[in-house]
Amino acid sequence: MFIATTNYVPGMEVVEYKGLATGEVVAGINVIKDIGAGIRNLFGGRVQGYEDEIIQARAEVLKELEARAAEMGANAVIGVRIDFDPIGGDGNNMLLVTVTGTAVVVR
């Protein structure tokens, strides 16, 4: 499965549009990581725990997108966009990761 942020697949032609393909993942952020993040925020630097959660959530949502596109009969997804949105409020550190794209058949 080819997944691209562009609206085409280099060297290939879109022969059929299958429709919108999506994926969603809600990732929880650990309280211990929050403490580490607060300390790092005071002194500067990267927060590896959060970065790892984001990387994992992105990988999961792309897998979901690929599976849904395959169910539609597509062999590629173009125009892909990934969004990260905090949800929960009141200290409930959760992250909604969504991905959308157009499922297509390319040759």
Language-model segment annotations:
Residues 1-33, 71-75, 86-107:
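N-terminal presequence-like segments and the immediate start of the first folded domain
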Residues 21, 34-81:
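Short, well-ordered alpha-helical segments
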